[in-house]
């Protein structure tokens, strides 16, 4: 079967939420989170398996593709996403199958077909030039698929799937977001964790859960944030947000993170992150309507028939944000264009005038 999108209505979401497939992907995320509990970013599990190293090699090749597509058109004028991202995206799609077959020779052509779409869709949407938690979920599905096909062994590799692979993926995504000014897909704006990512906060909260000295309120201490930004994903995210949202304090530009900082224990934050991910990512139609079902992520019975599938990112998404999604409050996943942080900052530097963004 060719991976396809099937979640089109609120009824589909309800069926999905009660499905074994949704439970499988959530359990996978929880397993990864628990595997990094108490570990800093550089405390990888040694030795790093050949499978993890092969996946790093795939990510490295994708990172190299960015250099082949520098921003030229409207470099300093457009407030929205850079069209060169589409060339990068096309390059990833063109090379994805070969990358997987060369670095994972044990995979069959059918398995590569199943995995490839998740790898392609991990970097953002070609047509809209945006990125959000749904694309981040695709990368997790890619790792899940490699685990399903016995490339990864969770007992051996779980910690490194986060501390090696996810951290490398996040680094590449920050580069892509910064260079191509990707627009936030389905962002809550100031009422979200981050304009783009969710899982670094979830994994980061689990890392810190047993910490005896750092508290959730420590994110307001700039010295502590700077000191621990490279050690813990959560502090790294706070440092990154502070570096791009410089006009006001965290309390004003990220009130949800400010609210979370009032929680007494990181273990409670971690618990809350799982609940929030279930509700705000896996339970939202504007995100899950872009989710691909496949041979290893089986579509539950009763869900709508698949829409037309195109592998090159040019699908029109005619049904996007319709039926149930039009009445969902999560955000404009593919409607109103929202300029990225990077665009707003760059334009502000040029004009020396504040741009209303947050």
Curated annotation (Swiss-Prot):
InterPro entries: Phstyr_phstse_ac (IPR004327), PTPA_C_lid (IPR043170), PTPA_sf (IPR037218). It is an enzyme of class 5 (isomerase). GO terms for molecular function: peptidyl-prolyl cis-trans isomerase activity; protein tyrosine phosphatase activator activity. Gene3D superfamilies: 1.20.120.1150. One of its GO terms (biological process) is mitotic spindle organization. Keywords: Cytoplasm, Isomerase, Rotamase. GO terms for cellular component: cytoplasm; nucleus; protein phosphatase type 2A complex. Pfam families: PTPA. Its EC number is 5.2.1.8. It comes from the Eukaryota. It catalyses: [protein]-peptidylproline (omega=180) = [protein]-peptidylproline (omega=0). It is found in: Cytoplasm. Belongs to the PTPA-type PPIase family. This is Serine/threonine-protein phosphatase 2A activator 2. It comes from Candida glabrata (strain ATCC 2001 / BCRC 20586 / JCM 3761 / NBRC 0622 / NRRL Y-65 / CBS 138) (Yeast).
